[in-house]
């Protein structure tokens, strides 16, 4: 269902729009966590560590998919808000063509350099072979990853957050079932985990594409539209490239962090792998709220209703703080039980490392959600320079403090670096939000 985000009060509009997106992300993260749970429980601690060691590299590829998602979403949102239906259709096909070309390039790069990338992050030798195997299979699904993310970006831009949910419900269930069959029954190890993800991702991408192409039949303009428009391509990439750079910088930072973690051995890597999956689960939920605000902001700018943006920002922050509360309680108080999802009681060192991460990082969710909501407004406004600049200090501080603190606190020092980066990044995004001028409206006092 297509939803106009420019009319009703943000409290009602954002909440109704958000719920299906939240469920979508939750199910997506559940099957990501299921990979690690099944790997750890049925293939062993080393298998969990191997999947976890390759994770920061997969996030680099994800950065490109997310960038194209944002580029398509913001441009389509503006055209939809301006009621340019023909432009919407052309923007979508332009985004598809661009993402497919990019996907092919990334696949070729990943295929030829996967082993080198695993060596760059100093992957422990006992998990190197499994890590490379997982990464090779994952790389074959990059085109599906790009395709699915562009589709979901367009659905979100049109105010339809329910359709992606339906795809994810099916693919999440299928992924978990295939994980169990391939790993627990067939004993395929990490390759079973990778193939399960590949199949689930492929099915979701194809279903999303077929459904979206059907919807586009209703968006015929007065004049015949081309399949690829250079001007729209430039607009999409103006949003996508800074986002890709920002996400890539973060991903490279995560590679450095993974390299530091890897020096402490496979047990700490396994603990970190489980904890970072839980952390990513929470962060992606919060980022979904930010994505809602991006679509909300872009649609209202396209409709000439900028005065609605500050109220939407306040609503988003309130919702995100409420969303953060259960994660903080769960991860801080029940950290041992959370790590027990991935590892058996015999993995004492790994569980201890994961618990330390969760207890140190989770209380700061109340701060990082403010940054992520502000990011949503900034992206929707097209101010991508601000979006990128606010990320770099977070990365530098996180790596710098990790290197320094590990000398005194061991692996725990790595986890302690997270809050320092988040404090600076949140402060910067709030400064940039004020520079956009939306705070000048009397209704926008925050």
Residue ranges and their predicted role:
Residues 5-42, 56-71, 75, 100-107, ...:
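N-terminal transmembrane alpha-helices
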Residues 22, 26, 30, 34, ...:
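Generic alpha-helical transmembrane segments of integral inner-membrane proteins
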Residues 69, 138-156, 164-175, 193-208, ...:
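Short runs within selected transmembrane alpha-helices of multi-pass transporters and secretion channels
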